[in-house]
Amino acid sequence: MTPINPFRKLPIGIQEFEKLRTEGYLYVDKTAFVYELVSTGAAYFLSRPRRFGKSLLLSTFKAYFEGKKELFKGLAIDSLETEWNVHPVLHLSLNAEKYESAEHLEGILEAHLQKWEEMYGTNPGTSTFATRFMAVLENARKKTGHGAVVLIDEYDKPLLKTYHD
C-alpha cells in the first residue's frame, strides 16, 4: 500500500478502487457506508446522476466482496469488518458499448453469461437467460459456500441509447 502523502494525486476519471488504493490517489473514505450497506440489506438499487461515483462505489463493493482486505487498510471498514468472507462476484458493466440493437445487447449478455457458466458450471435443461442466470447464481453458491454478489453498472445505458430511437 502506498504511504499516506498529503499531496496525493487527484483521481480524475479513475473509477477503480484497487487502482486508487495501490497507486496513491486521494480517496475520500466511504467504507463505513459500504459496511453499513452490506451488513443491513440484501439488494440495493443505487440511482444517482452521472459522474456521482457509482462506478467507483461498485468497484469498492467488488473489492470488498472479493475479500481484498489489504486494499482497505487504514480505512473505516478495516476496523469494522472481522470476517472478510470471499464471495463470487458477477460484475456486469454496460458502459462500454453503443447498443445499436436489441441483438447487440443480447450478444453482450450472452458473452457474460457464458463466462460465468465456465466459472461456475451449467445446469442441463436451462435455456433462457433468466434460467441460466439463476443456475449460475446457485452453482456459484454451491461451489464457494457463499451467495453470489451481482453488481450491474450503467444499467440504464442501453435504455437511454434507444429511448429516442
Where are these regions (language model features)?
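Phosphate-binding site recognition
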Residues: 1-165
